[in-house]
């Protein structure tokens, strides 16, 4: 796959080192998602068999697929080019603390609202296009409903395991890979680059196709924030907050705060 090299100084606000071809862009955005899907399809029945919801397979995929592949690819690129990881992962411009806090709050709230407004579309898509997906492969099963199918102990073990994996490690590595590596290398698309990056990022979640639309709504403001400020620290914090908020909500469901106490 061809790339077009240009010049890059050590300052990440400078010109991008290379521009990926469309083919390479598609492959690098979607390949990790394909690998996660294969892992998920293989492991979901196993975790189901020992009493865990399907999402436990996603958390395991973060450990055995997402982090090793995405971080490993970045390290490989650094070694291949005889440079440091810092020259591979771009968009690392510092943002003044006050601006950072304000921007994070705005992007978090904005993304949360947009995602929530688009949730009904997800439900329509799920009912009309993916109603055939078995419960054992539905990542929402046992979280937002049917919690009685799983023991409280199993759900809490899953939640504790997912906290460092899905709230910290996964988002940090994904932001390094998607917004720090891939986004700068499609900068030739200008203002459309974050949109393309976000659509492909949402599609990369092949294991959860129902959430495609709302995921775009949630992550698009964040991607534009990182692109505008040339700082993955912005998107990294917002991404962590998204996943942390989801984790808190899931914990409340497990504990029966919103109804249905699990068995």
Cite the ranges covered by each PLM segment.
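A short, ordered amphipathic alpha-helix with a cationic face
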Residues: 31-33, 75, 133-137, 186, ...
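Short helix-terminus and kink motifs of transmembrane alpha helices
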Residues: 83, 115, 119, 123, ...
């Amino acid at each position: 796959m061809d790339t077009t090299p240009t010049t890059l100084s050590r300052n990440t606000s400078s010109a991008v080192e290379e521009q990926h071809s469309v083919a390479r862009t598609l492959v690098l955005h979607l390949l990790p998602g394909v690998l996660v899907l294969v892992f998920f399809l293989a492991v979901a029945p196993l975790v189901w068999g020992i009493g865990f919801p399907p999402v436990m397979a996603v958390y395991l995929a973060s450990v055995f697929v997402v982090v090793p592949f995405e971080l490993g690819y970045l390290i490989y690129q650094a070694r291949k080019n005889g440079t440091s990881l810092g020259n591979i992962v771009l968009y690392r411009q510092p943002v003044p603390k006050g601006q950072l806090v304000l921007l994070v709050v705005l992007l978090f709230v904005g993304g949360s609202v947009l995602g929530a407004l688009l949730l009904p579309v997800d439900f329509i898509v799920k009912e009309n296009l993916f109603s055939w997906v078995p419960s054992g492969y539905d990542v929402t099963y046992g979280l937002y409903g049917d919690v009685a199918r799983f023991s409280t102990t199993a759900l809490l073990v899953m939640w504790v395991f997912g906290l460092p994996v899905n709230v910290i490690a996964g988002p940090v590595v994904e932001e390094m890979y998607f917004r720090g590596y891939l986004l700068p290398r499609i900068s030739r698309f200008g203002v459309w680059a974050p949109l393309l990056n976000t659509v492909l990022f949402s599609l990369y979640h092949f294991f959860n196709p129902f959430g495609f639309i709302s995921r775009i709504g949630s992550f698009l403001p964040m991607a534009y924030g990182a692109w505008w400020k040339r700082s993955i620290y912005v998107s990294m914090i917002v991404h962590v907050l998204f996943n942390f908020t989801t984790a808190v909500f899931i914990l409340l469901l497990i504990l029966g705060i919103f109804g249905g106490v699990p068995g």
